[in-house]
Amino acid sequence: MTVFKRGKSWCVQVYDPQTKRPRHIGTFPTRKEAKAAEQDATRKRATGGRETVKDFAARWPRDYPRPRQSTNLHNTERIRKFVSEHGNRRLDSITTSEARQWALKHPSDLSAIRAMFNDARRDDLILINPFLGLGIKQSRGRKDLPADWLTEQDIQKLEDAARLVHGSYGPVMAAMIRFASLTGVRPGELWALRFEDMVGDTLVVRRAMDSKTRTEQLPKNGKPRTIVLPARAREAVESMPRFQGQERIFVGPRGGQLWGGAFSALWQPVRNAAGRPDLTLHHMRHFCATRLLELGLSASDVAVQLGHTDNGALVLSTYGHPSEIAARARILQAVDGFESGEVAAMRERKAAG
């Protein structure tokens, strides 16, 4: 530990055994406050360093909860392998080299483990997070998909496959596919919709079904939203059969609530029959966003339909390619107009007048 004066302030540094370099704790107006901070850092390092990975992991979801319970359950699942192998070790004993080796073998677990060590770092239980800055590329999921990755023809094939493999329930599956691809709602939101949520040409997304906790919750951003209900989406619902007294728009083959696990069993034969075993229902949301951008809507407009609250930033980063194609088409149209002599003719008429 080191306390020293720099200008009019007092600085505190501690030695980091992993980086073998001093780490800055903070700057304080008086030496007394700096010494107190030094003692506090020493105490936290002494007590925090003794906590094992297993002990911290056990209390992590409780002491550092995320807003959604499903996220806490997901994180708990993702750290399980790491805890089983390193649970008896002290938090501060995990080196960056070990973290990198683990992350290379288990890239899908990296985000959750990094978040756990981040929380330990914020409370000064460890000096550094060994899982930060590893330079390991993680999957971008649905990002960077080409504009023609999912087309209208693909959607139609999925609908046809649904009718083929599911018999009397086929029209419901087909309607669900069409509805999701036109509205862009998330799967959990789709399974929570009620007929009363369709109001004219609008759809009110009030709730979402959480398949991990088997509960009904608010939509992802914590509040209801009103979006556009295209005519074809309404027609898809009106054309499908219903159970007597059915309240949810989309239900299972026997009228029960749809959850992720049950839907996967229904979805797998459909996508296989359509020749697209790589698809998930969430990809209908991607199709919706891509289609709206190709129709010339702005990223902020598409964000409203999808339920994003970032004014289109995520739409641009995830689905930016269609808008670029549309932009090039508009530029080409403008250039063609110029090269065809329209602009020159206008100038000549203006000069003559």
Language model features: what each stretch is:
Residues 152-155, 208-209, 230-276, 300:
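Active-site/catalytic core of tyrosine-dependent DNA strand-transfer enzymes
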Residues 24, 92, 126-128, 139-161, ...:
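DNA breakage-rejoining catalytic core of tyrosine-based enzymes
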Residues 118-129, 180-204, 300-301:
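Short, charged phosphate-coordinating catalytic segments
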Residues 106-111, 126, 132-191, 285:
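Basic, Lys/Arg- and aromatic-enriched nucleic-acid-binding interface segment
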Residues 18, 40-46, 54-112, 116-119, ...:
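Basic/aromatic-enriched alpha-helical hairpins
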Residues 2, 135-136, 192-239, 317:
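Conserved tyrosine-mediated DNA breakage-rejoining catalytic core shared by Y-recombinases
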Residues 1-3, 160, 212-213, 219-226, ...:
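C-terminal secondary-structure termini that scaffold catalytic or DNA-interacting sites
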